[in-house]
């Protein structure tokens, strides 16, 4: 398996990087746990390079475009979770920012381990631009999960037409929606796949089509209905 992986690297990684990778593998072939983490992170980096290239061409397809509907509530959530600095214009630390990414994704799925490419929109919404790969998962405390559940209820209560819907119902109809995220004129544009019942979006009382927070360098424009 390691041999096959190495052959793949030789075909896809620049020559100057191969020596560093070879040195690491030689030193850690007896530590399978650490080597596994290294390979996972390396694969994520390669996947993200592909995504970055796609952004400049045709955009990147995502499956959680509906997360933009609740984006306006995320700064409040991050503050209550204690992730933000005192002036609320940024995160206290990289650890808090990573937690914010995984907390955002909890509105999409309860899965704990999430491939980094699936977190692309959450990274945009949290202003995460570090080249360092994200961990496979991020454990959230019970009080953090409880605050997320409270926010789910608040979103449903504030959206009059969806007030009697379960969160699972909202997930299947709006949150887990396909879209294409693209960089246009130095800002983000998200074009969301439309469905017949998107007429309900007109009843949302808050803005979700232009998203900008203090920690986001670029505006996210949402094209949806």
Please report, for each region that a protein language model flagged, where it lies by residue.
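Short, compositionally biased pre-sequence/patch detector
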Residues: 1-225
